């Protein structure tokens, strides 16, 4: 009974260490070009719905509103698990850096033959001098000291996007939030 108050903290630290180990392993595999994609036709709309469903409880616990209007199919060629991982990393970051009472909106659209999925938050934003480095390994913004972070999530997401012949774009303003957009080639009909 004495240790009961420590249990949630221990569970949180254990989850963080597990995530760190998984991220380090995947980052090493990506660096050595050893990640194989199980490619097939994927509906980005379904990926968005699945990832938003999996993150909704975490957002609600923090007091953050997660809005994700139903997305159209948005067919792409890729690895569904890895595409989910990209969006999971973007959405988890948005939740971590958005204060209670804030909001996150996930939108998708087609533009110039590309499928775009944007994760926009009302978080702390990223300073202009930090924006070029956010995809670097182990990078932490000056505002990230209070958050558990491996410093690998955005690196992994960007490298996985590149494996899918895509990229992640960033728009951010300090004090107003950030918008990370996954851009992938749209699969032609």
Predicted ranges, named:
Residues 32-37, 75-78:
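Conserved micro-motifs of the catalytic ATP-binding
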């Amino acid at each position: 009974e004495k240790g009961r108050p420590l249990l949630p903290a221990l569970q949180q630290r254990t989850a963080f260490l597990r995530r760190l180990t998984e991220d380090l392993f995947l980052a090493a595999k990506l660096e050595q070009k050893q990640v194989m994609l199980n490619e097939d036709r994927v509906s980005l709309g379904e990926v968005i719905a699945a990832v938003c469903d999996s993150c909704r409880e975490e957002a609600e616990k923090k007091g953050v509103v997660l809005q994700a209007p139903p997305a159209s199919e948005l067919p792409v060629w890729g690895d569904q698990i890895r595409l989910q991982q990209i969006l999971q990393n973007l959405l988890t970051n948005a939740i971590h850096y958005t204060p209670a009472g804030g909001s996150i909106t996930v939108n998708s659209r087609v533009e110039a033959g590309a499928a775009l999925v944007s994760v926009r938050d009302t978080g702390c934003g990223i300073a202009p001098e930090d924006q070029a480095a956010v995809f670097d390994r182990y990078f932490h913004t000056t505002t990230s000291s209070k958050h558990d972070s491996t410093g690998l999530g955005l690196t992994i997401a960007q490298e996985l996007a590149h494996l899918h012949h895509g990229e992640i774009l960033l728009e951010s303003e300090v004090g107003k939030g950030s918008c990370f957009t996954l851009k992938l080639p749209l699969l032609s009909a």
